Amino acid sequence: MLAQKDAERGILEDDKKIHMRETVESLSADIAHEHWLASKEARELTTTSAAKLPILNTEQLAPTWRSAEPLLVIGARTELDQAAAAIFAALVEMHGVPARVECAEMLTACNIANLDLSGVALMCVSSVDMKTPAHIHFAARRLRSRAPHAKLLLGLWSAKDDETGAELKDVVGTDDFARTFHQAAAIILQRATTDQGGAKAPARASAALA
C-alpha cells in the first residue's frame, strides 16, 4: 500500500497519520451504519464476497462467544494497522459478532497488563505490512500469556500468497492466518459457531514477557 510505504519513509507526518486513521475509522463507522439501515432483502441480493458470509444471531453463537465483545482486533504496530483493524472489526460486526478495537500501544510490555481481555474468545492482530515477524511474535506471546483460552488470528493484509502466510503463522505462533478480510471473517464466523469450552478469566501479565 502506498500510504504504508510513505509512512515507512517518514513522508507521512504524525498528524497526517492520525488524521488518516480517524478518517478511515469514521468511514468504517459509516459503512456499519449504512449496512444496519439496509433492508434484509437488499443484503440478500448483494453479490459482494462479504455478503456471502452468514449473518449470525446471538442464538447461533457458541457460549464462549456470547460476551459483550468476544472479538478483539488490535493494530500490530502502525496507525495504518489500527485503521485496518477498525475497518475489519466493522465488517465482522455486520455479520453478528461484536468486536472491540485496540491500538498497538496496548501490546507493549508496559501496557499489556492493562489490556482488558475479559470475555474475549478470539484476538486478531491486524498488520498491513510485516517486514519481520519478531514484533508480532512478542506481541503474540504477551497476548497468549494474558488470555491462554482465547484463539489468536494474524491478519496480514498485504501477504502475497497463502504459503508465506502459513510460514509466518508458524513463526509467530498464531492459531490462524488470513491475508484478506474475507478469509479472516470466515475463520472468525466459523469459530464463533463451533468453539467449545467455558470462559476463563485472563491471566495476569508476567514481567518475563517484557
Each language-model region and where it sits:
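Peripheral docking tails and interdomain loops at the edges
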Residues: 149-210
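Structured cytosolic domains appended to multi-pass membrane proteins
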Residues: 1-167
